[in-house]
Amino acid sequence: MSITPDRRQELIGEYANKANDTGSPEVQVALLTERIVNLTEHLKTHAKDFHSRRGLLMLVGRRRRLLDYVKRQDVKRYEALIGRLGLRR
């Protein structure tokens, strides 16, 4: 259910703006998206896992706030990010 360290490093390398960039909004959104996808798959087989469902909703809300921040800062960066992640919006 969690992201493996190798996958985490792969995502950080792919979405980082510069070397050793782990805190930029793009990296955070990419990591949250990976966790959301994993939790969504988990909930498809465990439909009554309401604790995980609440965690999923919290992750989606956190990702939404980060995306809103990126959109306020730079609309082109926002559009590029949602395009790379394949998010609707």
Swiss-Prot record:
Molecular function as annotated in GO: rRNA binding; structural constituent of ribosome
InterPro entries reported in the protein's UniProt record: Ribosomal_uS15 (IPR000589), Ribosomal_uS15_bac-type (IPR005290), uS15_NS1_RNA-bd_sf (IPR009068)
PANTHER family: RIBOSOMAL PROTEIN S15, BACTERIAL AND ORGANELLAR, SMALL RIBOSOMAL SUBUNIT PROTEIN US15M
SUPFAM superfamilies linked: S15/NS1 RNA-binding domain
Physiological role: One of the primary rRNA binding proteins, it binds directly to 16S rRNA where it helps nucleate assembly of the platform of the 30S subunit by binding and bridging several RNA helices of the 16S rRNA.
Gene3D superfamilies xrefs: 6.10.250.3130, S15/NS1, RNA-binding (1.10.287.10)
Keywords in alphabetical order: Ribonucleoprotein, Ribosomal protein, RNA-binding, rRNA-binding
SMART domains assigned to the protein according to its UniProt record, in alphabetical order: Ribosomal_S15
Known partners and oligomeric status: Part of the 30S ribosomal subunit. Forms a bridge to the 50S subunit in the 70S ribosome, contacting the 23S rRNA.
Key word S-adenosyl-L-methionine present: no
Family per record: Belongs to the universal ribosomal protein uS15 family.
Keyword Transmembrane in annotation: no
Gene Ontology cellular component annotations, sorted alphabetically: cytosolic small ribosomal subunit
Designated name of the protein: Small ribosomal subunit protein uS15
